A protein has these predicted regions:
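Active-site loop/helix belt of alpha/beta enzymes
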Residues: 60, 66-174
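Active-site-proximal beta-alpha core segment in soluble small-molecule metabolic enzymes
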Residues: 2-110
Length: 175
């Protein structure tokens, strides 16, 4: 993506082990590109901060929220506020905002899917307000998946993650 001229690249999987170094290697090689990633636990944030500081880079990190998928992310609440504060305070990383993956919202009825999405986004907005009330920066919100892309695309208060429209996951034809 860096070679292709992308200016903003989000690695939407939490890097661990040697992948931390690989990400920072790309960020160092393509200094004109804003590389960022997600994190959902203090160990990962610490590893990212330590490696970024050693590389002389400040890496934007999105707090990965579990909004119902149950696969990645930290549930909105006090533990997530504490983790966001850690991202904000450690040298080497900075808060990029909130990341959410809503792949569990794939009802075949668009009205049902929209209602569930709106409820989920209300929770995200409430959590964001909690962070801001604690004087923690929330520069942005990024989220989405293939089935909810049309909903995210209609809102300018956050960025869309387009899902798998190029690869088209099995079964999405019916959703």
């Amino acid at each position: 993506l860096g070679q292709a001229g992308a200016r903003d690249v989000l690695l939407a999987n939490q890097p661990v082990g040697p992948n931390v170094g690989r990400l920072l290697g790309l960020a160092g090689w393509f200094r004109e590109v804003r590389f960022s990633t997600i994190a959902d636990d203090a160990g990962a944030v610490g590893a990212l901060a330590e490696a970024a500081q050693a590389a002389g880079i400040t890496l934007p990190v999105w707090l990965d929220l579990d909004v119902g998928m149950g696969r990645t992310g930290i549930a909105p609440g006090q533990a997530a506020i504490t983790l966001h504060k850690l991202i904000d305070q450690l040298p080497g990383v900075e808060s990029a905002g909130l990341h959410l993956y809503d792949g569990h919202l794939h009802d075949s009825d668009p009205a049902q899917r929209l209602a569930k999405w709106q409820s989920m986004m209300d929770e995200v907005r409430s959590f964001r307000a909690s962070l801001e009330a604690a004087c923690l920066p929330v520069p942005g919100v990024v989220g989405g998946g293939t089935p909810t892309f049309p909903f995210h695309a209609q809102h300018t208060d956050h960025e869309c993650s387009p899902g798998t429209t190029l690869l088209w996951d099995f079964g999405y034809r019916d959703k």
